[in-house]
Amino acid sequence: DPLNEERRANRYGFGL
């Protein structure tokens, strides 16, 4: 899921 990927990215600090 793209939303899950976005949450994952935010967790890494990409801040999508």
From Swiss-Prot:
Domain of life from the UniProt record: Eukaryota
GO cellular component: extracellular region
Compartment annotation: Secreted
Swiss-Prot/TrEMBL GO biological process terms: neuropeptide signaling pathway
Chief place where the protein resides: secreted
Keywords for this protein: Amidation, Cleavage on pair of basic residues, Neuropeptide, Secreted
Similarity comment: family membership: Belongs to the allatostatin family.
Keyword Amino-acid biosynthesis part of the UniProt annotation: no
Positions carrying Leucine amide: L16
Tissue-level expression: Brain, subesophageal ganglion, retrocerebral complex, thoracico-abdominal ganglion, peripheral neurosecretory system and intestine.
Protein role: May act as a neurotransmitter or neuromodulator and play a role in the integration of information within the brain. May be involved in the control of visceral muscles due to its ability to behave as potent inhibitors of peristaltic movements. May also fulfill a neurohormonal role on muscles of the gut and heart.
Protein name as annotated: Callatostatin-1
